[in-house]
């Protein structure tokens, strides 16, 4: 938000009324100063990470040491087709991730509001070469723009997968005992022949690069057509398309990923988020911003103090 060129492009292409309708606000772009704690968390709690591909529209924080050999600075123009730039739509950026130069065949995707706050192993993300994930259904009320976009994904999934065949082939992965009560819709919907929305912990997500390539081969027309959406629109396809495809293909190892992750919407759970960071209650947390957070400056200061409590030392990624 502090970059004049980015701000000028944002103002040039944006329509405030349309953006508000589609869930676009400055809360999605503002810098609340926590990024350094993301790098500290990776270095302290996941030292096994070999490479970080840091994606921006061309900027770099002043404090970031871009010469760090573990860091690959990636601009949108390095992997997104030129005709779709500039883009301010995260779901467009995410669908092209597999084109990032040097990206490993197995990778973990983090949004900028996902943080590692406790020690975590590679096996948390991959086992037997496959992503760890939870395959459980969720009722989709379609009350929000986001849920409507998820339904766009499911239409593609149902065109390419037969639910009964998937269940028969990968039964143990859909009815893993550790899922507990979260799997209740899996049992209830056994007779139903179509897929519905999958529940997602909304946190760090492991992927196979081949999944993206396969989805693009199957649904490239739809993905290309909606890549013109510089801002979020109800016609979008979200990254859940790739995750759901990966699960339906059986390319995952079952794990109740809710056991060590938590999303905190700061609008209603800022105190819980601060306490969870201080106590390192989870391995992974999502700090979900909102433009209407009351006492915003106070909340951000308390979150910063919590992060600094567990991650006080500079990482090698800081100058």
Model-derived segments and spans:
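ER/Golgi luminal nucleotide-sugar-dependent glycosyltransferases, focusing on the catalytic module
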Residues: 1-108, 115-319
């Amino acid at each position: 938000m502090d970059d004049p060129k980015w701000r000028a492009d944002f103002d040039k292409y944006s329509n405030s009324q349309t953006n508000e309708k589609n869930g676009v606000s400055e809360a999605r772009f503002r810098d609340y100063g926590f990024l350094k704690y993301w790098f500290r968390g990776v270095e302290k709690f996941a030292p096994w990470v070999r490479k970080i591909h840091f994606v921006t529209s061309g900027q770099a924080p002043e404090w970031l040491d871009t010469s760090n050999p573990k860091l690959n600075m990636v601009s949108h123009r390095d992997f997104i087709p030129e005709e779709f730039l500039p883009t301010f739509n995260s779901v467009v950026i995410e669908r092209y991730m597999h084109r990032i130069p040097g990206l490993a065949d197995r990778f973990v995707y983090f949004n900028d509001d996902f943080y590692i706050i406790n020690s975590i192993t590679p096996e948390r993300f991959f086992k037997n070469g496959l992503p760890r994930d939870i395959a459980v259904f969720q009722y989709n009320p379609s009350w929000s723009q986001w849920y409507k976009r998820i339904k766009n994904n499911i239409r593609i999934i149902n065109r390419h997968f037969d639910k009964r065949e998937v269940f028969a082939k990968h039964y143990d992965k859909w009815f893993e005992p550790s899922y507990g009560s979260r799997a209740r819709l899996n049992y209830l919907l056994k007779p139903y022949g179509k897929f519905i929305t999958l529940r997602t912990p909304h946190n760090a997500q492991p992927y196979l690069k081949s999944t993206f390539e396969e989805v693009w081969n199957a649904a490239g027309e739809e993905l290309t057509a909606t890549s013109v959406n510089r801002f979020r629109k109800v016609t979008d396809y979200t990254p859940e398309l790739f995750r759901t495809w990966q699960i339906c293909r059986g390319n995952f190892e079952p794990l109740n990923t809710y056991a060590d992750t938590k999303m905190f919407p700061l609008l209603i759970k800022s105190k819980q988020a601060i306490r969870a960071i201080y106590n390192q209650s989870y391995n992974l947390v999502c700090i979900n911003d909102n433009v209407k957070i009351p006492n915003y400056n106070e909340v951000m200061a308390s979150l910063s103090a919590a992060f600094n409590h567990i991650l006080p030392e500079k990482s090698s990624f800081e100058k």
